Each structure stands twice: as C-alpha cells, then as structure tokens.
C-alpha cells in the first residue's frame, strides 16, 4: 500500500485511483467487472488471469517477494521470542489478542489460521482473534486497542507501512511464508499505455531501494 501510494501517486504524471484490500477480495472484484487499469495480486493469481486471456501480453512484472512476520505496538518494550515453533506457540498462546487480516480472503490470514491449527492452539486462542479486512487495518486496530500484550501477524509490508507498530521478526522457518506479488495491465484497461508507464516506474531498477525499504525482496 505504502509503496504504490509513494511511487504511483507521487512519481508519475498521471492521476491514479487506488483500491486496496485482501488479494482474494481484489481478485473477485476484478472478475466481477469492476473497472481496472492495473492489477497487483499474487503471481499465482496474475498467472491464472493471464492463462484465461485477461492480461495484456508482456505487461506482467514482479514487484517482489513479501514475507510474513510478527508485530507489536511500537510503544511497548515487549520483544517476544518467535525464533522457533515452540517459542512462537508460547508467544501466541500468551497474547491477549492476535490481530491479523481476513482468514478467508487474504494470503497472510489464511496462513495464520493454518499455523494456529498446526501449533495446536487454535481452540485456545480463537476467541482472542481480531480479524480485519487487510493487514494494514489489523495493525492500525492493534495500535488503537491500547493493549500492550497484543500481537499482530501479517505481511511485513503492512507492518512497515504502519508507524505505530514494530516488526519483531519473521515467522520461524517452520512457518515461513514468502509470497511473490506481481503487477499487470488487464485487457479491459482504458489507459494501457499509462498503466505500462506505471509498471515501469514501480518495478524499475531505480526504485529497487524503495521497494526493499517497503518490505519487498527482489525476485
């Protein structure tokens, strides 16, 4: 969210209306026929649409890999241990609330649900889950909760984007999640050339450091 606002909103001379949400929600909106000049989804979703003949040939570009991590409120001194599955289990089980994105529509939310079940603590923590439409909203709500013992789990881009929360670290290897996000021009775009210019700016080498700072690792 922060990356696209910064690069597409400020650095190119076109007006850009941005619509953010869980990737499955965005995918479903596109399929439903909502007007769209640029699509930023997981690589798997973009490839699916490309195979269906929905994407302008040659317009697909990878923005980067995004990993999933654990966050706390920025104003707490807490530094929970998440270095392995056992410590992560203890940390999550002891949290007063666990803030995460939509567990049906978002990449990270689906992963969190599976992780809690695999750790064997779902039944213990399910009443403490605070689920939100996307990770950025989840992080903002964690900050506004004034609960110093809360934990957030979402993609690092959404943690970095929210100044009022702090990234503790990435999920341990047993639960590592790295998702490739890609951008493309849909065939129903009414501004295909402007869309291609936006992709060139967003994914160009000159903005590699900006993407890295926003939480996107090079593909």
Stretch-by-stretch model annotation:
Residues 34-37:
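Short acidic/histidine-rich motifs immediately flanking catalytic phosphotransfer sites
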Residues 1-20, 24, 28-32, 43-66, ...:
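Exported/periplasmic ABC-transporter solute-binding proteins
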């Amino acid at each position: 969210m922060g990356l696209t606002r910064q690069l597409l909103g400020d650095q190119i001379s076109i007006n850009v209306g941005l619509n953010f949400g869980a990737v499955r929600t965005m995918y479903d909106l596109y399929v439903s026929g909502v007007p769209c000049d640029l699509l930023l989804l997981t690589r798997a979703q973009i490839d699916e649409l490309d195979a269906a003949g929905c994407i302008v040939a040659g317009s697909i570009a990878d923005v980067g890999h995004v990993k999933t991590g654990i966050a706390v409120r920025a104003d707490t001194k807490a530094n929970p241990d998440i270095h392995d599955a056992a410590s992560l289990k203890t940390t999550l089980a002891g949290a007063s609330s666990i803030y995460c994105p939509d567990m049906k529509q978002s990449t990270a939310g689906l992963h969190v649900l599976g992780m809690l079940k695999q750790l064997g603590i779902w039944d213990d923590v399910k009443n403490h889950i605070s689920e939100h439409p996307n990770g950025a909203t989840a992080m903002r709500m964690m900050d506004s909760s004034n609960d110093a013992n809360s934990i957030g789990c979402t993609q690092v881009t959404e943690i970095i984007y929210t100044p009022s929360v702090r990234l503790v670290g990435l999920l341990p290897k047993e639960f590592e999640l790295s998702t490739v996000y890609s951008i493309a021009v849909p065939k129903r775009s009414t501004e295909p050339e402007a869309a291609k210019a936006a992709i060139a700016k967003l994914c160009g080498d000159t903005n590699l450091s900006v993407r890295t700072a926003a939480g996107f690792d090079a593909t």
